Structures are given as C-alpha cells and as structure tokens.
Amino acid sequence: MVESGAAALAAVMADDEDMVRIEQALIRLEQAVASNSLGVDEDFDFHLAVAQASKNQFFVSVLASIRPHMEFGMNLMRNLSLSKTGERLVRVQSEHRDIVKAILQRDPLEAETVMRRHLQETRQRMFGS
C-alpha cells in the first residue's frame, strides 16, 4: 500500500515544517469533524501531508491521481452511514492521531503499521458493515 510506505518514509524524512503541516492537517480535520462536517477534503489533505512529508514524489503523485476515487469512497461511506458517522469519526480520528504520533516519534515501523491498520479498518468500515 502506497500510504503505508509513505507514512514509514515520512517518519524518517520529514523535516520540522512537514511535521507542522501534518499536525495542522490533523487539527483542521478535527475541527471539521467537531463542526459536524464530513471532513472529506480535510481527511484527504491529512493523507496528502503525510505523503508530501515522505519526500517521495511517487507517493504524492499516486495519491493525487486517486483523489477523486478516495473522495467518492469517503463521501459514499459517510453519507450511507449517517447514523453511525459520529462513532466512526471518533474512531477514525483516533487512528489519525496514532499515525501522527508514530511519525512525530520518527518510528517508521510503527508509522507503517498504524497507517496499514487505518487503511484496513477503513476498508472494513466501507465494505464490511
């Protein structure tokens, strides 16, 4: 998975500005969620900030090229499950915080692991329930 590799590389390659961008992207996402927004753009921007911090243009390009598909999937999942959206968003935000924590701690193995888990959980939320 591209994003797992990007998270691992971000934990190693990110400079201070990248770290701030990732944290700010998470804050914007949390603000969107707190205001009852679906936060689709903010969610994508968080993942893009991680990819950019990897300093690997391949990861950034792949993520940018699949943006419409990711946004469609996020919108579909969140709109079809509005009754569960609150609890799901709390869980998703926890997963995002775990990703940020691993990157800030410069732990590539943990960053890769928590990103992979987040993507697996997302797939399960989308198709498994």
Predicted regions and their residues:
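Extended hydrophobic/aromatic segments used for targeting, binding, or gating
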Residues: 74-82, 86-89
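Conserved amphipathic alpha-helical segments that form helical-bundle/coiled-coil interaction surfaces
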Residues: 1-77, 95, 110-121
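Short amphipathic alpha-helical segments at helix-loop
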Residues: 31, 80-84, 103
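C-terminal-biased regions
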Residues: 85-104, 108-129
